[in-house]
Amino acid sequence: MRTRRQTYPPIAESLTARSIVQALPASATISGNGGPKKKKNCVNRGLWDKQIPTDLLQEILSRLGLKANIHASLVCKTWLKEAVSVRKFQSRPWLFYPQSQRGGPKEGDYVLFNPSRSQTHHLKFPELTGYRNKLACAKDGWLLVVKDNPDVVFFLNPFTGERICLPQVPQNSTRDCLTFSAAPTSTSCCVISFTPQSFLYAVVKVDTWRPGESVWTTHHFDQKRYGEVINRCIFSNGMFYCLSTSGRLSVFDPSRETWNVLPVKPCRAFRRKIMLVRQVFMTEHEGDIFVVTTRRVNNRKLLAFKLNLQGNVWEEMKVPNGLTVFSSDATSLTRAGLPEEERNILYSSDIDDFVKSSHPTFYYYDCSAWLQPPHDNFNF
């Protein structure tokens, strides 16, 4: 059987690969018949600014994160123009806090505050009625809520009103430090609870739960140091980074179920004279881990220390790269690219940082949290 030869249209010149090496201008060439030399200018601009169609370049650059977008803009003037045109700055998170001038936490009256537009949305959550509620952690627009009476742990999404209950936490678990890796609607969600064991806290108890499981799984690990109590924890690069009250750092790997105490000395933020008057937080930005506080009391200027895992050291950032940190007990979110006056600033969960109020929220610090609004946030 004869096969028909298939023909293809000629490839457009703009899609063909050419050498990106700059060719030196040739001052002269020799003619084929050995005649006199003739001057000829030879210029090759390469692929960067001419060989990639604009719409394709914009599509590629629009898929990059902010840091990668900035790096790509350094290639040439054309890439700079297109990178800036599609650059996506991270939006400010929203603050969730009790509405004190009404019933407040006693009646389940809460507020969602959008700092970008100075808008407040008044909401009522019967499941948050009472004072014995703690917002243990916040991530991807979800809250992990702990109620002391009755003894309940559940997820709550203030933007949609969704609620997901978890199994009862095992006995002898204090639930003082709970956190999770991703939204409970994600298959990668993992919830962990830390409880120090024994009189001198030489052993740490880690309880884990994943969506679909009916019970918690309990692990016991040697803390290797006495007197360590975990009070800050974030999830980054597939690991839970756990910070103790004395500034010691440990890592829990949920996939391997391992616990390691890192040989990293506490940073300067954990000096006694700083900790007595200023809160210390831990946050994450594009895979980097930071310990942050303010430079002075009643001052929002950011003091940041970046974790260097290769050198096992916290490096103080003299200029914190224009980052803005929104801090609360439940979570601390980091943003880049905000207006100049908001860079290198640490905002607390006190509404007075944004608008003047006769009912500051610091009275309910464990009932307030910063939240990342969903992309399809049509209800607000």
Curated annotation (Swiss-Prot):
Signal peptide: none annotated. SUPFAM superfamilies: F-box domain (SSF81383), Galactose oxidase, central domain (SSF50965). Kelch repeats lie at residues 190-233, 234-279. Keywords: Kelch repeat, Repeat. Residues 47-94 form the F-box domain. InterPro entries: F-box-like_dom_sf, F-box_dom, Gal_Oxase/kelch_b-propeller, KIB1-4_b-propeller. This is F-box/kelch-repeat protein At3g18720. It comes from Arabidopsis thaliana.
